[in-house]
């Protein structure tokens, strides 16, 4: 085996298999086939070996080629002095099994970068600590009630906070690049799309009425997959199908029971407070993680190939969405995060990959891994936040290939905890930045669709939403 290193995260491997090994595989394959071979003019298994070899030559050679590749790749993985993070890249059809001589083939494979582990012990860290106020609970409770508000079509001009049913058309020059079907949005100051932002959406749409057609601009993200269009403004036309005014429900005993069998408003407020505390803990963990990573990255410099970064984008976003879900953030918050991340994906993914490689290397050295019970705990927590069953959550994660992302999430959190325990930590009370009501609303629509656009699993559930108060969409799915 010959290994060359064209890049810090890439290896080119040439594998050479001796002729004797090829002949042994061929002999074993024919030994297995001859007793069962069906050749015209002979009973099954009675045809001469030479005739069997002639008739089944192509099939056996292809089978042997596959077996040799699988077995040799397994041995390469076992013996190699690198840690693979991807599958071997080669063209199976172009590899030929020679009639004589050695069997050689070549492949490339992405590997973990090699670097010296930063000194992570005895760091000095500041831990921001939030306090949840009654005003915070009031605001969160209003957001919960807003999701169960009755909506009535209105001829009155739209105001910030109203709901709009709109369609959209996006044009670059003379070319229509996408059209948006009917979307129900909250009229906010800014509209976030999957790959673009309309910064003055509130100003554009305020005072609009049913049937109005409003034109403006949206700006594509600086990290858009189409490099020529990064940061470019395109024309947007929004058509108002309907203006809807909301009427919040009253906290009657019947409504409290419908929400989640709460007996009093105080019980509901405690539920909402617990959700806010989980979100505050998440922000604290993220701030601590950011401080730790900043210190570790300062002494660990390594290159990342652009192809690796592009391939890891969706995987990294999946991992972060899982973190948001388990921490109780609602659907709109997650959608805003997803849109912002997509718009600046390249830079964010590079930073996250560096974090991952450093934390993974520390995990290897400290023998840290995810235990079966930890998977169950995470799945149980996600299930509780989404008012779903652990079995259904696990099935969804397995179906969408996110179990590996869950494993990374568990391992990286354990490493951060290890580093924090070894650090000198000073707590600092902080005030949560006030989130202006109706500042931004996010929708899942790509203004400029790309060929490689993997859908991010929608976060359909909201931790602030008490059990029993599922959306109609989820109730219908549960009936299936």
Swiss-Prot record:
Location of the region described as Disordered in the Swiss-Prot/TrEMBL record: 426-480
Q: Where is the composition biased (Basic and acidic residues)?
A: 429-480
UniProt entry keywords in alphabetical sequence: Cell cycle, Cell division, Chaperone, Cytoplasm, Isomerase, Rotamase
Q: What is known of its domains?
A: Consists of 3 domains; the N-terminus binds the ribosome, the middle domain has PPIase activity, while the C-terminus has intrinsic chaperone activity on its own.
Q: Which residues cross the membrane?
A: none
One protein family per Pfam: Trigger_N
Q: List the cysteine pairs that form cystine.
A: none
Q: Which GO terms describe its molecular function?
A: peptidyl-prolyl cis-trans isomerase activity; protein folding chaperone; ribosome binding
Of the GO CC terms on this record, one is: cytoplasm
Recorded hits in Gene3D superfamilies, A to Z, give: 3.10.50.40, Trigger factor ribosome-binding domain, Trigger factor, C-terminal domain
Cite the InterPro entries for this sequence.
PPIase_dom_sf, Trig_fac, Trigger_fac_C, Trigger_fac_C_sf, Trigger_fac_ribosome-bd_bac, Trigger_fac_ribosome-bd_sf, Trigger_fact/SurA_dom_sf
EC number(s) per entry: 5.2.1.8
Record protein name field: Trigger factor
Ranges for domain PPIase FKBP-type: 161-249
Protein task: Involved in protein export. Acts as a chaperone by maintaining the newly synthesized protein in an open conformation. Functions as a peptidyl-prolyl cis-trans isomerase.
- The UniProt gene name for this protein comes to tig
What is the uppermost EC class here?
Answer: isomerase
Which reactions appear under catalytic activity for this entry? [protein]-peptidylproline (omega=180) = [protein]-peptidylproline (omega=0)
Q: Kindly state a single biological-process term from the GO annotations of this entry.
A: cell division
